Swiss-Prot record:
This is Putative uncharacterized protein LOC400692. Residues 35-100 are annotated as: Disordered. Residues 37-48 have a biased composition (Basic and acidic residues). Residues 85-97 have a biased composition (Low complexity).
Length: 123
């Protein structure tokens, strides 16, 4: 697993398993089925892009402060797409910020701009 601090070089490791996915056990069958664990809110665990929040709101990652990776415009996400958060490099000067990664049809990219539930911009 590459060191996330290399994000300071402009590299976002969205094409790999995110450390948050791996550390939270989100791989294997659950990952193949598109399972999204919404972290510390019991009412939202297990939601995906296709259920109650609709396709514009995505999986909260454990340890990201309760935020979401949302895409703008909402049409950027379709049912079956996936997204997750990666912490930004501490050298970015904003330790609480993070990268939101988007997977569409198996192709992983950095989704930017994206907003957290609290209105902060993550990029």
């Amino acid at each position: 697993m590459p060191d996330a601090s290399l994000g300071s070089l402009g590299i976002t490791w969205c094409f790999l398993e995110s450390p948050l996915e791996v550390s939270s056990g989100r791989f294997g069958l659950a990952r193949l089925l598109g399972s999204q664990d919404h972290g510390d809110d019991p009412a939202e665990r297990g939601r995906t892009a296709t259920d109650a929040w609709g396709p514009s709101r995505w999986g909260q990652s454990p340890g990201n402060g309760g935020g979401y990776c949302d895409a703008s415009p909402p049409s950027a996400l379709a049912p079956g797409d996936r997204a997750w958060a990666l912490p930004a490099s501490p050298s970015s000067g904003a330790p609480a910020s993070q990268h939101c990664c988007l997977e569409k049809a198996g192709t992983r990219t950095k989704a930017s701009p994206v907003w957290g539930r609290d209105g902060n911009t993550w990029n």
